[in-house]
């Protein structure tokens, strides 16, 4: 059961623009809307999607477009001694073959783009250069080495098979914990010990805080300890990643049609990598077949096909295959936690200590270093009243696919760590797990509650949430169910996990309403729908607030040319921040 939606809308300074007062204002507005408020609305997207009329990347072929296929590394780590494309160019239908040398000559920047993450003693996040096509070394299996563009996909695949790459294999390390051991192969010379950043930013004075926590642990009656593995995973969305790149020679501009979580953020990042102005590239996204964090930022393939479109003068289309996606899509998780909880003789929580290491992969991915640092640690101490927390995290390079956000992005790891160590505390103290939790819940009278991490909970009633969860789960009836299962040779377990996470962390959001004439209204948002009913939810809010017909509203999204302020559909924040911005625009329209 989750208390997230009810109690944690304003848990950090990241989401201060959408706090409880804002949401109360929205709720007050809703009470004054039309009579249709609260009535069931059929999703306007459903008819189109169920009839197969949704437009995805593959549904918008461009005239005279070429097919792209990538040559990928079969090695975990290797030096590229040479790349011979002569045979590939002789394949019927092959138009061009690009290598890392071509991308170097194009002068593009690194795909590793990340906001600053401070380390210990003034250290900073190490971000090695990540090319669109590898030119001197490959750092993980599946890394892009060459791009073949041809008249057909079959010809492009034949051309890729004809590319000869001479590799010299090098020592590699793929295990997270092995990467930080003495003597492990070093991926990057400026990242000793394979440490991208040694983060202790959960406290403004980490050294003093660490000493205080150590003192409490040394005198604690009980210390519960658990070591936890957070397994690496791959997203496998229904629609794989894909894009079509076009180049307009007359205007020296690009158009990238791509399945993304936000056209504007994709446009801005891609322009920065290609070292062109934002006005020189347009990014559009229509329907998206699943994203979950996977499709937020640019990938090597997008930069490569954009350059190929310019070089060939023709649109270039690429769609990932399933096996290809497993080797090239951003992965997630792959981290390890040592967690300790200090308790007094009565079972009161005194201090929490976490030592966390998380794999970045071979490069730094889109906000990948935020996952095991800010995202994870700001969810502590969950619903528990813990006065002292020492949370430290090391981001580590390994010869694996880059990791990036996926469904929760660090927040589930925080809840897992908390609840596992609380259960261990119940075991070693002999206190009932539920009673131990009740004893240590943050009181409903303690709000606003500032955590040792520095975030503030604006409200909450965790005891009530716990009671409701136990009732819904029929906790008291578990023993009987377990006994019945045992008779049938089955195992049955039960547990408690309260997920309390900060959300709504995108930096800025906006909305625009235009009135072209008559009763029609055009609502333009930067937000990208990936299955969240945006075309239904946002127009309905506007219709109810303005007292107009829902059918008269046209909803626009997924086009960087609209120039609406905003980020992308990330961080569980779209409904809250977009509804907030929509209400503000509505208020402006009403009062002006």
Task: Enumerate the predicted regions with their spans.
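Short, surface-exposed loop/turn segments at secondary-structure boundaries that line and modulate
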Residues: 98-143, 177-189, 265, 283-304, ...
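Alpha-helical support elements that line or immediately flank enzyme active sites
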Residues: 70-104, 147-167, 243-312, 369-379, ...
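Flexible, low-hydrophobicity surface segments
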Residues: 21-198, 223-226
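Single conserved hydrophobic/aromatic residue that forms the stacking wall/gate
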Residues: 1-22, 579-592
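Glycine-rich loop/linker segments at domain edges
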Residues: 45-48, 114-128, 198-243, 334-420, ...
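Phosphate/diphosphate-binding loops
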Residues: 151-152, 310-361, 578, 582, ...
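Beta-strand segments within the central parallel beta-sheet cores of soluble alpha/beta enzyme folds
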Residues: 100, 279-286, 313-323, 350-355, ...
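Accessory "access/gating" subregions that flank catalytic or transport cores
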Residues: 213, 217-220, 224-234, 438-514
